[in-house]
């Protein structure tokens, strides 16, 4: 599903690629490079996702799939059954919190 995080638009295929990568890493108990992603997302913000948790978060990028390094502000959320839950961002949120990306939560 296409989504805009802050002022950054993502196509449906970019969102799907991030979700698929998160799923593959999660299922193989692996992470992107030397990072901790994907990792547990506790949904402290209380987003009403279309699928039930538990959730994993994984960075979403405009250029290719995240493979390590700085994660940036934007995340795709999947559940541990690899269902897409939504996209969220630190952009526009206070502290280390998240807000929903448009068209996605």
From Swiss-Prot:
Its EC number is 4.6.1.24. The keyword Nuclease applies. One of its GO terms (molecular function) is lyase activity. The active site is at 39, 57 (proton acceptor), 90 (proton donor). Disulfide bonds join 5-101, 23-82. The keyword Nucleotide-binding does not apply. It catalyses: [RNA] containing guanosine + H2O = an [RNA fragment]-3'-guanosine-3'-phosphate + a 5'-hydroxy-ribonucleotide-3'-[RNA fragment]. CDD domains: fungal_RNase. It comes from the Eukaryota. It is an enzyme of class 4 (lyase). Keywords: Disulfide bond, Endonuclease, Hydrolase, Lyase, Nuclease. Belongs to the ribonuclease N1/T1 family. This is Extracellular guanyl-specific ribonuclease Fl1. It comes from Gibberella baccata (Fusarium lateritium).
């Amino acid at each position: 599903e296409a989504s805009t995080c802050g002022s950054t638009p993502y196509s449906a295929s970019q969102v799907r690629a991030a979700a698929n990568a998160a799923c593959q890493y999660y299922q193989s108990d692996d992470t992107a490079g030397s990072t901790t992603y994907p990792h547990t997302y506790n949904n402290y913000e209380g987003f009403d996702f279309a699928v039930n948790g538990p959730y994993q978060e994984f960075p979403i990028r405009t250029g290719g799939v995240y493979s390590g390094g700085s994660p940036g502000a934007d995340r795709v959320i999947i559940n541990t059954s690899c269902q897409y839950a939504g996209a969220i961002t630190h952009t526009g949120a206070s502290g280390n919190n998240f807000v929903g990306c448009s068209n996605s939560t």
